[in-house]
């Protein structure tokens, strides 16, 4: 049966629950609104301001791209600014091509989202996968 045959009587895919900071996603939890910033991650104030607007609009998770190691390192500044302003919303690092950025981000934010299709070197992807297991943070792998 398709999950979209009758839009007034839908069923959700069965998933396991995962904690992202204080938020539980998957399982029988409600669907949480999330969005991704468009500001340059190296522009801390612009990313913080955009994140605050998203949170105030109802986002429960804020995704921030971290395409480089420097971007990943700057996630600490972004997170610190948000926490100083009283915002505790979990942050998600969106990683695409840089395995080292994922390793850095995993030590800073509540979740790391990785698309393995963007990793050309399978060996590098396996290396990052093992390092994230030791950190015990949620990691989303998509293909």
What is each residue range found by the language model?
Residues 29-46, 91-97:
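Active-site mouth loops of central-metabolism enzymes
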Residues 47, 51-54, 78, 104-105:
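Generic structural signal for hydrophobic
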Residues 28-31, 58-60, 85-91, 108-110:
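Short, well-ordered coil/turn segments that N-cap beta-strands
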Residues 133-143:
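Single conserved hydrophobic/aromatic residue that forms the stacking wall/gate
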Residues 38, 59-80, 116-125:
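Glycine-rich, proline-tolerant flexible connector loops at the mouths of alpha/beta enzymes
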Residues 66-108:
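N-terminal active-site wall of soluble small-molecule enzyme domains
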Residues 1-34, 140:
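N-terminal amphipathic alpha-helix/helix-capping segment at the start of soluble metabolic enzymes
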Residues 92-102, 109-129:
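Hydrophobic, well-structured modules enriched for small/aliphatic residues and gly/pro motifs
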């Amino acid at each position: 049966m398709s999950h979209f045959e009758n839009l007034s009587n839908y069923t959700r895919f069965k998933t396991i629950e995962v904690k992202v900071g204080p938020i539980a996603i998957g399982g029988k939890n409600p669907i949480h609104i999330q969005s991704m910033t468009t500001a340059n991650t190296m522009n801390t104030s612009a990313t913080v301001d955009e994140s605050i607007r998203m949170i105030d609009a109802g986002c429960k998770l804020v995704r921030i791209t971290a395409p480089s190691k420097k971007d990943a390192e700057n996630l600490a500044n972004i997170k610190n600014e948000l926490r100083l302003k009283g915002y505790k919303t979990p942050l998600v690092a969106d990683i695409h091509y840089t395995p080292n950025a994922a390793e850095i981000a995993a030590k800073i934010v509540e979740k790391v989202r990785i698309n393995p299709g963007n990793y050309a070197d399978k060996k590098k992807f396996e290396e990052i996968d093992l390092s994230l297991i030791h950190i015990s943070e949620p990691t989303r792998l998509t293909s």
